[in-house]
Amino acid sequence: MLRRWNIVIESLRRVHSSDLENLISASLYNRTLCTASESLNHGVVDESYVLAELSSLLPISSNKTSVSKEDSSSKNQVAIDSFLSAEDKLRGVFLQKLKGKSAIQKSLSSLGIGLSIDIVADVLNRGNLSGEAMVTFFDWAVREPGVTKDVGSYSVILRALGRRKLFSFMMDVLKGMVCEGVNPDLECLTIAMDSFVRVHYVRRAIELFEESESFGVKCSTESFNALLRCLCERSHVSAAKSVFNAKKGNIPFDSCSYNIMISGWSKLGEVEEMEKVLKEMVESGFGPDCLSYSHLIEGLGRTGRINDSVEIFDNIKHKGNVPDANVYNAMICNFISARDFDESMRYYRRMLDEECEPNLETYSKLVSGLIKGRKVSDALEIFEEMLSRGVLPTTGLVTSFLKPLCSYGPPHAAMVIYQKSRKAGCRISESAYKLLLKRLSRFGKCGMLLNVWDEMQESGYPSDVEVYEYIVDGLCIIGHLENAVLVMEEAMRKGFCPNRFVYSRLSSKLMASNKTELAYKLFLKIKKARATENARSFWRSNGWHF
């Protein structure tokens, strides 16, 4: 023991104190310490031997280090989790590949997330969970507070499974509802049938209807109408006709059954088939109503028989019926399709004179038709009337108005619709904001561009690389090159790399303005950002998501 201490002390004495750290780390020295051994036993004592003696004589406790590592890792985990939404955290549990449902449910419960049916719907509808994972998550969710085990909750999982064509899991959930004490209703049956029809599994949808009583859903006129509606809305009208004829006499039909068949043939423009169904409807003791006439008028319009549709419209009053909004909408749609905008406006004014209140479909067809026909002033006038009557457009409808307006002409009309919709309380979609930014950028309207950008961020939409490119382009057009560089640097700080065309345009303008130093600094930053982007693309192509 004394000899080992002497070797270590003699070695440390002959090494300069500044070189001690390098000696212990063994990273800078490959030569051995021979001086100590010459005076003691004339042997060779290498560096590894000295380090081994030090480690045995001076042990260092690793408890403190491990604790600090655990603390830092927990802090990092908290920092990472702060960037994740509740839906991503819940989906992330299934990425861990835990074995057993109990382990998965325990991990889900440990997250401590307050569940709601909206969060459950987001987890199921987004991402790429397997069918088994979706069912496992739903079984856990309905046992948690905040999510009730009722028909509404089960309709969410049925719709999510049907949308992804996971039909075996969908049928298991539908059959298991009764065992869980929840009786399926017509909505659940409709979701399942529509899921089959959507992927052209018509026979399975019909078989599901015939087996509906085994699920607790009565085979009635309402369920039969739901089957017909699923088939006709997906253009399987011939199959609907076969089922309609097969069930005639077994299931009592009502006027809705006949109207669904008429609407199906109307979408295909089959006037003769519509007339046959209308004749059967009258023979069965059901008089055609305004909905029947509206489908008939639409079908005639699709075949170009506008004059016949006008004749039917004029005969409605003679038969004791008063045209409603559906009938007027069909006439307006026919004339818009024929690009006869004056006649469509005449029927709209006639509708108001007859004190028939226009609905959202009326204004949707009018405004969209006038915009596509480039009757922008008339479209803006109708849009203002729409808002003045308290009819608010949906988010998707506002986007459909803005899309054609942002494809031709200056952005004035698009900005009018955007500002009035926003003022009325309508929510603007992210795609609508991008359409506006792109159009304003092209025309160099940077004041409006920056205002819309601020309003987009106020609405909760994050700025992606596409948005930054529009801003940089707009600033380049009006010559605000320094501001364009600042925006591009902000984009790179957020991990985005603008495309080569945007950078090339900005760099060329900087060089033309004798701002060589600024252009060179931007080049270095773009070079680094592009390398990072290429690395990220390589990671993702190999399945490494960081």
UniProtKB/Swiss-Prot annotation:
It comes from Arabidopsis thaliana. Signal peptide: none annotated. Keywords: Repeat. InterPro entries: Mito_RNA_Proc_CCM1, Pentatricopeptide_rpt, TPR-like_helical_dom_sf. The keyword Repeat applies. PPR repeats lie at residues 150-184, 185-219, 220-250, 254-288, 289-323, 324-358, 359-393, 394-428, 429-463, 464-498, 499-533. Gene3D superfamilies: Tetratricopeptide repeat domain. Belongs to the PPR family. P subfamily. This is Putative pentatricopeptide repeat-containing protein At5g43820.
